[in-house]
Amino acid sequence: MPSYTLNYFNHRGRAEICRMLFAAAGVQYNDRRIETSEWSNMRSKMPCSMMPMLDIDNRHQIPQTMAIARYLAREFGFHGKNNMEMARVEYISDCFYDILDDYLRMYQDDNCRMMFQRSGDRNGSSEKRTRYQETLRRILPFMERTLEMYKSGGQFFMGDQMTMADMMCYCALENPIMEESSLLNSYPKLQALRTRVMSHLKMSPYLKKRSSTEF
């Protein structure tokens, strides 16, 4: 088994999908959490000067959230059973990542650095908030229909097997739902899916014991 180290800030943020994949697979890894105060000295050492970054056996470094997530999903069997399923898992995951990305951008400073705190103005810049809300309106109805189309009577996007797509539905919507608890009231299928992910045999213990962070 390879040795994995996942590098990210001490937040869920863009790394949580990777942590969920490790948890679902029951694979041990080093969850290296970088304090914001340490980041300026480490930034130049990271590929693309960004995190998350996955280190494999101290030989290979993979930056970019979804590149890491796809790699882990393929390695651990959460990427679909054939090429068509894999394509579906990927576009569903990318749709949810669009929501996550637009949400987190509302809490970046003028230099595109995450603040990891909510100011008194909860809404952030009106332009970024508008973009985020448009992304929700564009994606959530489509995902609700997609879930009904593909699940084939099963519990998840690809039937009876949980994939990266289901985990992305859970983690990408965590912060938005914390801010707006009624977000999925018009999307009961997505709401029920998130409950099933939360209750998954491997996922439930992880979600209960993980560190509590604001983002």
Swiss-Prot record:
- MF GO annotations: glutathione transferase activity; structural constituent of eye lens
Q: Which cysteines are cross-linked by disulfides?
A: none
Write the record's keywords in alphabetical order, separated by commas. Answer: Eye lens protein
Q: Where is the GST N-terminal domain?
A: 2-80
Q: Which CDD domains match?
A: GST_C_Sigma_like, GST_N_Sigma_like
Give a brief account of the tissues where this protein occurs. Lens.
Q: Which GO terms describe its biological process?
A: glutathione metabolic process
Q: Which Gene3D superfamilies match?
A: 1.20.1050.10, Glutaredoxin (3.40.30.10)
Record's keyword annotation contains Mitochondrion: no
Under Pfam families, the record lists: GST_C_3, GST_N
Stated role? S-crystallins are structural components of squids and octopi eye lens. Contains relatively little if any GST activity.
The family line of this record is: Belongs to the GST superfamily.
PANTHER family tied to this protein: GLUTATHIONE S-TRANSFERASE (PTHR11571:SF150)
Q: What protein am I looking at?
A: S-crystallin 2
